[in-house]
């Protein structure tokens, strides 16, 4: 017994110096990193708070515990330190509208790469949007561009009109009942159905037909957005989640099954497209011209290299398009519709413009996109809605791997991530009078060129949003469906601007997290 006690004591005693040594090594290493970041790092000369330069934990704390609040801390940094700040150990933020086009440049100007952590955190590295390398990104994006061009979207206009008509029919189900419905859920369902019709030839899976407008679909994306700060800073977590069997994940979070079902459907469609190509059934692709019926048919018949034709990579492409196309478009629609309904003068003028068009057309149906493009007040409303919903509020870091950038006499070393937020561009008081106010009239008549310069809801450059044409068409058609003489008479119910104003600046922005959403009732037109 005494020997056992002595042995245990010896082991415990001998282990203490080792533990202390490991702690000392860890502290020394950590202090060395902090010293390097503060005094020897290539960005040490740039202004900003020391704590942000020393550790990434400062940013993580704001985004995780502050619900995406780091953007507003960066705004405070700019107010204190000036138009360029070091926002974390390796990255710079610039707040200067004139410099935007020097960060977000076209592909023929110079190589531009993305920040790897953006793709790592979402596990979609193989999609074109998350591809880091400049040349590989261009190679993967190029075949997609004609599909989402103005002409490409026009090919799908009848599909879009059909989905929007389904939305109108669903709203009429609530007409005169006094029942409250979630319009933000309906918009997410609509956007999801539109992407589905473009990717998949025929499907029985529709979100709008669900009695609650596929509430779980909306809530799934909402949860993922809130989780992004964790995934982006600790990307191994999302990889672990991917390993969880579907049967277990379905029990833990039944909503996730909807995305799995959509992903499985995409994979099946990709395999069909590859089979059609192999048998010669689909050989209609010409460079820059859309003839294939679905996105996948188009891609498998494009000039993508074989290495980029795998089912896994094409499925990743579809998943990113579905996520981005659902969330950002639906939120922009919600923001726009609420702001119109809150302003009787705006709603009246918009309805009058639609009434004139409908009288000219002589029928109670959705106008063509080309007709909606000619309505100045509608387009002013759409533009103002996109400005205030921002698209992405989060900075979008870009890396110039070969060329140093110069800003206000400071040389930004090659390889430095530099980001600029659309929020800063859109809220610039020197460019927009009362920038937080919804004022469509600001886009009518002679528009200050600086307003167009600062208008970046889809970003710019070689990595700009792929589908602004689709977004404009969708939103314009929805507005026509809701504010024409024959439209369902929707009215807000216990909903105000705070239910749509983006105040949580995650990678994709959200309104206040305690919001009960965009609630409306549908009155009878004579009420």
Swiss-Prot record:
GO cellular component: membrane
Metabolic or biological pathway, per its Swiss-Prot or TrEMBL entry: Mycotoxin biosynthesis
Enzyme class: oxidoreductase
Record-linked Pfam families: p450
Gene3D superfamilies: Cytochrome P450
Source domain of life: Eukaryota
Transmembrane segments: 15-35
General function of this protein: Cytochrome P450 monooxygenase; part of the gene cluster that mediates the biosynthesis of the diterpene glucoside brassicicene C. In the first step of the brassicicene C biosynthesis, the bifunctional diterpene synthase bsc8 that possesses both prenyl transferase and terpene cyclase activity, converts isopentenyl diphosphate and dimethylallyl diphosphate into geranylgeranyl diphosphate (GGDP) that is further converted into fusicocca-2,10(14)-diene, the first precursor for brassicicene C.
Similarity remark: Belongs to the cytochrome P450 family.
Protein name in UniProt: Fusicoccadiene C-8 hydroxylase
Gene name of the encoded protein: bsc1
């Amino acid at each position: 017994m005494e020997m056992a006690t002595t042995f245990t004591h010896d082991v415990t005693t001998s282990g203490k110096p080792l533990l202390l040594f490991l702690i000392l090594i860890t502290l020394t290493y950590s202090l060395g990193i902090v010293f390097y970041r503060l005094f020897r790092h290539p960005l040490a000369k740039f202004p900003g708070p020391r704590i942000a330069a020393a550790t990434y934990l400062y940013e993580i704390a704001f985004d995780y515990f502050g619900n995406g609040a780091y953007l507003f801390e960066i705004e405070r940094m700019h107010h204190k330190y000036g138009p360029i700040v070091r926002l974390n150990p390796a990255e710079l933020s610039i707040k200067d509208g004139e410099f935007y086009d020097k960060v977000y440049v076209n592909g023929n100007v110079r190589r531009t790469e993305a920040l790897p952590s953006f793709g790592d955190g979402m596990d979609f590295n193989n999609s074109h949007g998350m591809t880091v390398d400049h040349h590989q990104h261009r190679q993967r994006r190029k075949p997609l561009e004609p599909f989402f061009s103005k002409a490409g979207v026009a090919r799908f206009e009848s599909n879009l009109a059909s989905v929007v008509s389904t939305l109108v029919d669903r709203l009429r189900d609530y007409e005169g009942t006094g029942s409250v419905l979630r319009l933000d859920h309906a918009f997410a369902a609509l956007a999801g159905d539109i992407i589905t019709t473009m990717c998949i030839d025929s499907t029985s899976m529709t979100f709008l037909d669900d009695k609650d407008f596929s509430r779980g679909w909306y809530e799934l994306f909402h949860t993922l957005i809130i989780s992004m700060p964790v995934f982006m800073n600790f990307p191994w977590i999302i990889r672990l989640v991917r390993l969880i069997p579907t049967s277990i994940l379905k029990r833990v979070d039944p909503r996730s099954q909807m995305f799995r079902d959509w992903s499985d459907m995409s994979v099946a469609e990709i395999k069909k497209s590859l089979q059609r190509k192999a048998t010669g059934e689909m050989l209609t692709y010409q460079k820059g011209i859309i003839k294939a019926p679905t996105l996948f048919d188009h891609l498998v018949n494009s000039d993508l290299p074989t290495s980029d034709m795998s089912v896994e990579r094409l499925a990743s492409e579809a998943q990113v398009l579905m996520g981005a196309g659902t969330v950002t478009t639906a939120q922009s629609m919600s923001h726009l519709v609420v702001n119109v309904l809150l302003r009787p003068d705006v709603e009246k003028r918009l309805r009058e413009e639609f009434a004139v068009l409908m009288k000219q057309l002589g029928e109670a149906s959705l106008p063509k996109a080309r007709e909606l493009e000619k309505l100045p007040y509608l387009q002013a409303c759409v533009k103002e809605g996109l400005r205030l919903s921002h698209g992405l509020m989060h900075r979008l870091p870009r890396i110039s791997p070969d060329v140093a950038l110069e800003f206000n006499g400071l040389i930004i070393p090659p390889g430095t991530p530099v980001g600029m937020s659309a929020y800063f561009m859109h809220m610039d008081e020197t460019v927009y009078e009362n920038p937080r106010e919804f004022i469509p009239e600001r886009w009518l008549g002679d528009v200050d060129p600086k307003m167009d310069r600062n208008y970046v809801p889809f970003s710019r450059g070689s990595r700009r949003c792929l589908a602004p044409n689709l977004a404009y068409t969708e939103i314009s058609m929805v507005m026509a469906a809701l504010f024409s003489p024959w439209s369902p008479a929707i009215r807000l119910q216990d909903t105000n601007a705070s239910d749509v104003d983006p105040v949580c600046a995650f990678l994709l922005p959200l309104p206040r997290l305690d919001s009960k959403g965009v609630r409306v009732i549908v009155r009878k037109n004579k009420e």
